[in-house]
C-alpha cells in the first residue's frame, strides 16, 4: 500500500509539473490573442459538456445542443443572453454557469494577467544584473554610461508593486463577492416580497445570492430567474446593491482600486514604498486598470455624468408609460438608474425592454456599442509607449478593405446581414417581433458583451400559423431564431469578447 501511494504521489507530481510547464510555455511563447482564444474555447467546451451531462430540474424539458452551446458561450463571454428559460435548469447547472462567468470575467483575467506578469518578472532577471565581463574604462566614459542604466531600486520596486497588486486585486475580488453575497442573502431573508418570489419559483436563496452577486460583479448578466430582475423591480434595496457590485467590477474599478491603494497607504498596513510608487507612477507599473490621478478623477466624473444623463432621458421618455406601471416615483428612478448602469455593463434588466420608448432603445444601443473610458485610456497609454510611427507602419501595411472587414462596424454589418438572411422567412411573416431593428439591437448587444434584449411576444404576431400555438417564453429574442442564426450570434459573442481590450491587464513592457 505505501508503494502504491508513493507511485500515485510521484505520478500526480509529474502531471502537475508537466501541466505547469505547458502553461508557462504557452503563456510565454504564444501571442495574447491566441492565448485568450484558446482559453475561451477550452472553458466554453468544458462548460458545454458539463451543461449537457447535468440534467435540468424540469425532467420533461430536453434542451437542444445548440441552445446549451449558446448558453455556455454566453456565460464564457459574460454576455447574459439565453435561448432557454433559466428556471428549467437545475441548481448544479446554475452553479456551472456561475463558475463560467467568474473564470472568464474581465476581473479574473486581469488577475491572471497580473500573476503571469509577476512570474515573468521573477523568472527573468534583467540583463543589467548579470555581469558578463569587466572592462576598464575612463571615469568620463563611466559617468556618461551611468545615466543610461536603469536604477536597480526602480526595477525592484516595480516587481514589488506587481506582487502587491496581485494580493490587492485578489482581496478586492474576495471581499466584494463574499460581502455582496451575504448582503443579498440578508436582504432576501428580511424582505418578504423578494423572499416570496424565490419561494414561488423554488429557487434556493443561497444559490441565488451567490449567482446574482457573481453575475453582477463579473457583468455576466445570467440570473436564475426567467425574467432577470423584472420580478424584483419594486425592491429598491436589492437593485441598489447590485448597482454597486456592477460598478465595482466594471467602469469604476480603476476608481475603487486607487481608493483601496490610497487607504492602504494611509493605514500603513504595508510598506509605504509600494503604495507611494503606484500612486505617483501608475503608468510605470503596467496595469491598465491603475490609471493616473487625473484620469481616474475624469473617469469617475464622466461615468457619473453619463449615467445621470441617461437616467434623466429615460425617465422623461417613459415616466407615464406602461414601462413603470405600478411603481412609485422612487422605484421609477431606481429602475431607471439600474437600466442606465446595465446598458453599459451587465445587461441585467429590471423592466421589459420591448416596452421602452424607441428613442431610449437607440440610446441603449449607442451605449452598448461605445467602448469604455478605461479601454480608451489604456489605448492612449499604449500609443504613447509604442509611438505613433508604429501605428503609421501598421496602417500602411493593411489594405483599406481588409481593415473595414475586420473593424467592429464591418463585422457587425456582416453579422446583421447573415442573420437577416437566415431569418428572412420570419421577417416577412412576423415583422413586429422579428424586425430589422430588433435584430440590430440583439447583435450589438451580443458583440458589445452586454446582453440586453427586446424579447418576443406572441401578442405582436400578425399571422398565426394554423395548428401551431404560440406560447410565451421568458427568454431573449435570439431564442426564437433558427439554429444557423444562433450559431452566427455565438460567433459575434466570441469576436466581441476577443475584441475587448479590458481583459488585458498587465501590458508587456
From Swiss-Prot:
| Family according to the record | Belongs to the TrkH potassium transport family. HKT (TC 2.A.38.3) subfamily.
User: What is a single Pfam family found in this protein's UniProt entry?
Assistant: TrkH
Which Gene Ontology terms describe the biological processes this protein takes part in?
Answer: inorganic cation transmembrane transport; metal ion transport
Compartment annotation: Membrane
Domain remarks in the entry?
Answer: HKT transporters are proposed to contain 4 pore-forming regions enclosed by transmembrane segments with each containing a potassium channel-like selectivity filter motif.
This chain belongs to which protein, by name?
Answer: Probable cation transporter HKT2;3
> Which is one GO molecular function term here?
monoatomic cation transmembrane transporter activity
Q: What is its biological role?
A: Probable cation transporter. May be involved in regulation of potassium-sodium homeostasis.
PANTHER family per record: CATION TRANSPORTER HKT2_3-RELATED, POTASSIUM TRANSPORT PROTEIN DDB_G0292412-RELATED
Please indicate the ranges of residues that lie on the Cytoplasmic side. 1-32, 117-164, 258-296, 374-400, 495-509
Q: Name one GO cellular component term.
A: plasma membrane
Q: What is its main location?
A: membrane
Question: Which topology term describes how it sits in the membrane?
Answer: Multi-pass membrane protein
Provide the transmembrane region boundaries: 33-53, 96-116, 165-185, 237-257, 297-317, 353-373, 401-421, 474-494
Q: Any idea which UniProt keywords this protein has?
A: Ion transport, Membrane, Transmembrane, Transmembrane helix, Transport
Per the record, the domain of life is Eukaryota
**Keyword flag Hydrolase:** no
**Secretion signal, residue range per the UniProt entry:** none
Amino acid at each position: 500500500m505505501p508503494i502504491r501511494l508513493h507511485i500515485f504521489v510521484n505520478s500526480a507530481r509529474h502531471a502537475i509539473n508537466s501541466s505547469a510547464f505547458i502553461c508557462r510555455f504557452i503563456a510565454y511563447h504564444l501571442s495574447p490573442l491566441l492565448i485568450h482564444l484558446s482559453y475561451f474555447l477550452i472553458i466554453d467546451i468544458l462548460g458545454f459538456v458539463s451543461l449537457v451531462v447535468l440534467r435540468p430540474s424540469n425532467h420533461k424539458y430536453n434542451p437542444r445542443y445548440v441552445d446549451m452551446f449558446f448558453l455556455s458561450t454566453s456565460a464564457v463571454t459574460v454576455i447574459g443572453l439565453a435561448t432557454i428559460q433559466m428556471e428549467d435548469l437545475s441548481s448544479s447547472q446554475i452553479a456551472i454557469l456561475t463558475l463560467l462567468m467568474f473564470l472568464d470575467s474581465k476581473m479574473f483575467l486581469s488577475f491572471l494577467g497580473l500573476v503571469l506578469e509577476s512570474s515573468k518578472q521573477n523568472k527573468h532577471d534583467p540583463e543589467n544584473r548579470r555581469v558578463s565581463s569587466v572592462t576598464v574604462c575612463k571615469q568620463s566614459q563611466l559617468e556618461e554610461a551611468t545615466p543610461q542604466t536603469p536604477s536597480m531600486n526602480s526595477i525592484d520596486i516595480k516587481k514589488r508593486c506587481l506582487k502587491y497588486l496581485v494580493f490587492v486585486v485578489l482581496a478586492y475580488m474576495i471581499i466584494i463577492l463574499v460581502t455582496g453575497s451575504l448582503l443579498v442573502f440578508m436582504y432576501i431573508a428580511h424582505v418578504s416580497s423578494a423572499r416570496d418570489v424565490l419561494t414561488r419559483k423554488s429557487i434556493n436563496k443561497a444559490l441565488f445570492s451567490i449567482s446574482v452577486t457573481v453575475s453582477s460583479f463579473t457583468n455576466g448578466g445570467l440570473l436564475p430567474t426567467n425574467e432577470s430582475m423584472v420580478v424584483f423591480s419594486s425592491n429598491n434595496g436589492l437593485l441598489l446593491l447590485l448597482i454597486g457590485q456592477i460598478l465595482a467590477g466594471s467602469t469604476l474599478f480603476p476608481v475603487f482600486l486607487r481608493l483601496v491603494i490610497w487607504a492602504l497607504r494611509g493605514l500603513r498596513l504595508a510598506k509605504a514604498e509600494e503604495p507611494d510608487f503606484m500612486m505617483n507612477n501608475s503608468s510605470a507599473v503596467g496595469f491598465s486598470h491603475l490609471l493616473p490621478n487625473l484620469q481616474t478623477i475624469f473617469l469617475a466624473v464622466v461615468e457619473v455624468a453619463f449615467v445621470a444623463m441617461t437616467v434623466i432621458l429615460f425617465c422623461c421618455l417613459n415616466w407615464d408609460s406602461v414601462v413603470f406601471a405600478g411603481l412609485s416615483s422612487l422605484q421609477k428612478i431606481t429602475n431607471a438608474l439600474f437600466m442606465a448602469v446595465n446598458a453599459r455593463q451587465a445587461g441585467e434588466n429590471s423592466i421589459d425592454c420591448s416596452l421602452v420608448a424607441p428613442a431610449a432603445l437607440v440610446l441603449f444601443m449607442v451605449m452598448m456599442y461605445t467602448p469604455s473610458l478605461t479601454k480608451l485610456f489604456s489605448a492612449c497609454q499604449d500609443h504613447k509607449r509604442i509611438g505613433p510611427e508604429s501605428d503609421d507602419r501598421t496602417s500602411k501595411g493593411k489594405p483599406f478593405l481588409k481593415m473595414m472587414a475586420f473593424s467592429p462596424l464591418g463585422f457587425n454589418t456582416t453579422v446583421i446581414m447573415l442573420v437577416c438572411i437566415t431569418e428572412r422567412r420570419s421577417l416577412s411573416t412576423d415583422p413586429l417581433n422579428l424586425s430589422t431593428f430588433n435584430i440590430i439591437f440583439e447583435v450589438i448587444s451580443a458583440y458589445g458583451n452586454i446582453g440586453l434584449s427586446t424579447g418576443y411576444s406572441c401578442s405582436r404576431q400578425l399571422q398565426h400559423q394554423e395548428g401551431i400555438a404560440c406560447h410565451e417564453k421568458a427568454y431573449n429574442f435570439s431564442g426564437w431564431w433558427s439554429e444557423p442564426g444562433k450559431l452566427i450570434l455565438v460567433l459575434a459573442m466570441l469576436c466581441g469578447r476577443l475584441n475587448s481590450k479590458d481583459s488585458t491587464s498587465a501590458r508587456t513592457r
